[in-house]
Amino acid sequence: MPLLVKLGICELAVGVLSGWAMIAIVERAEALKRLGVRQLGRIRQTHLDLLMQGTILTVVGVAVASVPTWIGILLVLGAYIAPLTLGVLAFRPELQKGSMAYRGLNTAVLTGFTVAWVALAVTVLSR
């Protein structure tokens, strides 16, 4: 089984587990706020992104034979880190505009992710 498929399924598992946080938003929002969650919507955003990115990694792993290693690395980093940076904002929303470190990390991850997707498209179309 291709590594991208395995990593995609693992990310899907994390996304499914994060569904419990979605239940907590509905049934125990105050408890989440006591735990430091300041933006409940970011939990939903993280949950959905984990599910989507996990699905996409799995599909790419099945559909594309021999993804070049450097492209696979950038895809996995983007698929794993991007949702987690959204999760951080649930607790620290001010980081989005007030932290150069956060913005730098986010920009680097999304740039790498974009490069990987364009490179994957070029690779697939050239075969």
State where each predicted segment sits.
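Small-residue hotspots
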Residues: L4, G8-I9, G54, G61, ...
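Non-transmembrane, aqueous-exposed alpha-helical and coiled segments at domain scale
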Residues: C10, I25-E30, V62-A63, G87-V88
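Transmembrane alpha-helical segments of integral membrane proteins
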Residues: I81-K97
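Core segments of alpha-helical transmembrane spans in multipass integral membrane proteins
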Residues: S18, L40-V64, L77-L84
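Non-cytosolic membrane-interface motifs at loop->transmembrane helix junctions
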Residues: W70-L74, G98-A108
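Juxtamembrane boundary at the C-terminal end of a transmembrane helix
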Residues: W117-R127
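Cytosolic, membrane-interface loops and tails of multi-pass inner-membrane proteins
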Residues: I25-R42
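N-terminal signal-anchor transmembrane alpha helix
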Residues: M1-V26
